[in-house]
From Swiss-Prot:
GO terms for biological process: DNA recombination; DNA repair. InterPro entries: RusA-like_sf. Coiled coil: none annotated. GO terms for molecular function: endonuclease activity; magnesium ion binding. The keyword Nuclease applies. Belongs to the RusA family. This is Uncharacterized protein XF_1666. Keywords: Endonuclease, Hydrolase, Nuclease. Gene3D superfamilies: Holliday junction resolvase RusA.
Length: 137
């Protein structure tokens, strides 16, 4: 029998299912296909990583007690700003600074994440990325 505390008793989503986190559409400067100067890309990475960390902490993800080891599923839904659907590989690369910022907020190494990207057919003004984390048992 597991000694883990039930989700409801902990007052947090004990990694079974966490609340979703909504982030803005990633900058085109983060695309692996972008031909931008390295300083511009570096600035975009730093800004995106910091923003994701702040938003994850505001969402209450910074205080979660996570298992010490094991993998965590990272469900990423991309809602593009236009009808043009980007490929999921490019979007995952553009999402990497967000992933690092979320890992920073959780206090874990981002190697623990198993990414599940999905480019949605729905359009959202300005585009957005919705992230959920679930535990793998």
């Amino acid at each position: 029998m597991s000694k883990a505390m039930p989700i409801a008793a902990c007052g947090m989503a004990a990694v079974k299912q966490m609340q979703s986190l909504t982030l803005p559409w990633p900058s085109k400067d983060l695309s692996p296909n972008a031909r931008v100067h390295w300083t511009r890309r570096s600035k975009a990475v730093k800004q995106a990583r910091g923003y994701a960390e702040i938003m994850a902490r505001r969402a209450g993800w910074g205080g979660l007690s996570l298992p010490v080891e094991g993998r965590l599923d990272l469900w990423i839904s991309f809602y593009p700003p236009t009808r043009r659907l980007p490929d999921d590989d490019n979007m995952l690369a553009r999402f990497k600074p967000y992933r690092d910022g979320i890992a920073d907020a959780l206090g874990i190494d981002d190697r623990r994440f198993v990414s599940h990207p999905l480019v949605e057919d729905d359009r959202r003004t300005g585009g957005e990325v919705v992230v959920r984390i679930t535990g793998i048992e």
